[in-house]
Amino acid sequence: MKLFLILGTLLAALSVALGAFGAHGLKKLVDAETISIYQTGVQYQMYHALALIIVGILAQRNDNSLLSYASFFFIGGIVCFSGSLYLLSSFRAMNKTVPGFVYPITPLGGILFILGWLLLLFALIKK
């Protein structure tokens, strides 16, 4: 589906920009552990942006609702997993206490990623 191709390319471009910010701007504000956490968010965003592009290509060739569901799980995973790591890094950069709600969002995002990959697998098997 074209929407997933567009979102995938936008999220990939955003991950490059966020990675550059982490390497050049954020590095001046936080410790190495926080940079590592931030970069994990960037990496997983890029992996799953590329997965969205792949699913978008597959969806153009196959009418399979599982592909759409996989994409929504990948997007939700990016928002929850990478987004929570960006939030955590931002609070640390501002020398603020990280709110407790941020921590459980990260594993939720990881679960969404896993479900997205499993849905993609089922879509490929169903084909």
Regions found by a protein language model. Give the residues of each.
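Polytopic transmembrane helical bundles with strong interfacial aromatic enrichment
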Residues: 1-127
